[in-house]
Amino acid sequence: MDGAAGPGEGPAHETLQTLSQRLRVQEEEMELVKAALAEALRLLRLHGSTTTLQGSGISAPTRNSSITVPPGLPPTCSPSLVTRGTQTEEELEIVPSSGPPGLSNGPPALQGGSEEPSGTQSEGGCSSSSGAGSPGPPGILRPVQPLQRSDTPRRNSSSSSSPSERPRQKLSRKAASSANLLLRSGSTESRGNKDPLSSPGGPGSRRSNYNLEGISVKMFLRGRPITMYIPSGIRSLEELPSGPPPETLSLDWVYGYRGRDSRSNLFVLRSGEVVYFIACVVVLYRPGGGPGGPGGGGQRHYRGHTDCVRCLAVHPDGVRVASGQTAGVDKDGKPLQPVVHIWDSETLLKLQEIGLGAFERGVGALAFSAADQGAFLCVVDDSNEHMLSVWDCSRGVKLAEIKSTNDSVLAVGFSPRDSSCIVTSGKSHVHFWNWSGGTGAPGNGLLARKQGVFGKYKKPKFIPCFVFLPDGDILTGDSEGNILTWGRSVSDSKTPGRGGAKETYTIVAQAHAHEGSIFALCLRRDGTVLSGGGRDRRLVQWGPGLVALQEAEIPEHFGAVRAIAEGLGSELLVGTTKNALLRGDLAQGFSPVIQGHTDELWGLCTHPSQNRFLTCGHDRQLCLWDGEGHALAWSMDLKETGLCADFHPSGAVVVVGLNTGRWLVLDTETREIVSDVTDGNEQLSVVRYSPDGLYLAIGSHDNMIYIYSVSSCGTKSSRFGRCMGHSSFITHLDWSKDGNFIMSNSGDYEILYWDVAGGCKLLRNRYESRDREWATYTCVLGFHVYGVWPDGSDGTDINSLCRSHNERVVAVADDFCKVHLFQYPCARAKAPSRMYSGHGSHVTSVRFTHDDSYLVSLGGKDASIFQWRVLGAGSSGPAPATPSRTPSLSPASSLDV
């Protein structure tokens, strides 16, 4: 069984390993404390000698004089205590050099260990110290005043401390009493100098403040403080960039098609463009209509919706389009109501918004009337009663409404001969509605239902589709694979249309057409009918009397037929259940023009020298995409869920991390697996090659980073070591430019640094890493990017982050379906950004292509891939006017023409 523990690998063994590791860390801490105490005693003796000299009339060094730190003292003058890998503030206070009140970048000096006000925690969840005295020269130990009795009692007193914290408290007290140095300075005067924002907010807050001495910035996520040290080259935060970046994004291409779980999703417009939808975007694709796409095709996008589009209908004029969206919530948790947009496909301008506040959950099906040039629109929502309503298209006024059925409604349509006849079908039913209104007065229409009777024929579980024939009969396709012909009775056929008696339809013929359900029916211009099967994946053309004329089979890897649309001449467009859009005919077969994933996406990486990128996700497919040709280069079945990937700097191989702890190295040309390794049994969340290609880092949910040395352009690897110290699963990591160090984030908001070349050692003094340069910046926590976090963040609001290769902008993927663009570095709280909509689910990843010409973003549940063109300084083409920090795109600003 997967994940079963072998001998000696059970929970007891893991617990023993954890305890042993903790013991080793504590022993190291004791050595550090002993060394610090010895150095403190030596400095006290030096201080005593200085006092003696002063008493003898010899002048001692002043505060402004230059005194070097004794060689035994570390540059930061303070050991960092690290327990179980979590980050703990220094027990000895850091005091920088004197300077302007902005920032000071000299190395910190030692001070007595004062305590912060109640409620302030260190980065790892323990109490932290914070200096309150005036600044002094770097590296100088200065005495502090004894603690006054009137001060606030200790935060970690024995009465309120947990057993695990007491040894550390005793250790600190012992150090203070032995050296008489670590005295608490908690006077009212010193506390008055603290920033009032230094206390953390409540759960789910994101508050930040600057250390008064200018060494660090602290922000809070879920009440936990995260300390980030300011690089020495930054003298003042005021010199950092402010405002949104000059670069902007323009949606270039959308990969994918929503065929897995939707219907009424594929049509051909009068212009020849194919219209379909995915996520919140309605795509207008022109086969062969322009440079760049498969067969020279191009895309335009209607982006007026605020949540996922569920259905489409095309007006009889072939220009106007109606699209219905589902309900959702915005970033503040407020509900977004389902609505129908009627828009012009030539200008992409919204003409009418219908039903705001009238529908529940979402819009399930739409249809324009045909007999009166599309004057009316019928809508079925996704409420429990599946309300059927009729609307005046030009005025957006509801004319009639009625409860349809408690069962699912999958299709709706007007009779092309008579707008008073409406048909709905779905779970175990087909209903024929007579609309007695039609004068256009609001609410004057009545809808009367007559249920279809199956009689001697077996009643199917579902009737997913139907089509009207030129003679007025109706064909329905059902879950049994049958096509039923419904004809009107003789008396009703003589009845004039509007205002006459109810029309009665009965089954007059049945033909077994497919094995399994029939998902789509399409009436062709020559009067023949096409049917698309689910299980058998067959397309069949039917003549009069339901005689089969011709058929073709869709390849299995494309899935079953979901929708059929007739193109130019004999050309057909077919949408499939595996989110592919095929183009061809029954004689020559079909080839894909649009392809996509079918389940949640997480893994994304871009090629180091080409405009190509690779994706993987829960559908177990690994796909390499050509960003220039907007096409799928190749795909393969991983057999397991892929969660992360990265190209070797040579581009010859790519590594893919799976949800079982396995990782694969594949040749990008042959797709051959050249390496198959397993590290632990937890999922892998990040894989990253060093910039020189000599190391590979694997971040796992078992809290460890596995390091491998790499040779032969990535085809060979061997275990080099493990980075152990995080207290939660690894979420992000980056390599330094020299390939020797790693910065990593974890699930409990840690920022740790590792010396890989030195033996995968944890760098306990994080202050020393403040000036290190990073080859990539994908960690979501760090000084250079902390400004991207919104107020009130709970720590999960940002899923992915990527700095451009030119180090000018940062792209952010958030949990509210948005892609943001910030200036880099982004080290100001509440930094403004350019915000872009389109995804219908949390955005899981963003990456820039090798030359920063494109940005690729992944949707989670919507399985969409967006390719954005980066415009701005130095790029061709006008930059679209996108407001910064727009709460939601207005219809005008959301159109990408």
From Swiss-Prot:
Q: Provide this UniProt record's keywords sorted from A to Z.
A: Acetylation, Cell cycle, Cell division, Coiled coil, Cytoplasm, Cytoskeleton, Microtubule, Mitosis, Nucleus, Phosphoprotein, Repeat, WD repeat
Extent of Polar residues compositional bias = 51-68, 175-190, 883-897
Q: Which GO terms describe its cellular component?
A: cytoplasm; microtubule cytoskeleton; midbody; mitotic spindle microtubule; nucleus; spindle; spindle microtubule
Q: Which residues carry this modification: Phosphothreonine?
A: T882
Q: Which PROSITE patterns match?
A: WD_REPEATS_2 (PS50082), WD_REPEATS_REGION (PS50294)
Q: InterPro entries annotated for this entry? A: Beta-prop_EML-like_2nd, Beta-prop_EML_1st, HELP, Quinoprotein_ADH-like_sf, WD40/YVTN_repeat-like_dom_sf, WD40_repeat_dom_sf, WD40_rpt, WD_repeat_EMAP
* SMART domains membership: WD40
State the compartments where it is located. Answer: Cytoplasm, Cytoskeleton; Cytoplasm; Nucleus; Midbody
Cite the record's Low complexity compositional bias ranges: 96-108, 118-132, 155-164
Please give the residue ranges the record annotates as the region Disordered. 51-210, 876-897
Q: What does this protein do?
A: Regulates mitotic spindle assembly, microtubule (MT)-kinetochore attachment and chromosome separation via recruitment of HAUS augmin-like complex and TUBG1 to the existing MTs and promoting MT-based MT nucleation. Required for proper alignnment of chromosomes during metaphase.
**How does the annotation summarize its subunit structure?**
Homotrimer; self-association is mediated by the N-terminal coiled coil. Interacts with EML2 but not with EML1. Interacts (phosphorylated at Thr-882) with TUBG1, HAUS1, HAUS2, HAUS3, HAUS4, HAUS5, HAUS6, HAUS7 and HAUS8.
Q: What PANTHER family does this protein map onto?
A: ECHINODERM MICROTUBULE-ASSOCIATED PROTEIN-LIKE 3, WD-40 REPEAT PROTEIN
User: What's the protein name?
Assistant: Echinoderm microtubule-associated protein-like 3
The gene coding this protein: Eml3
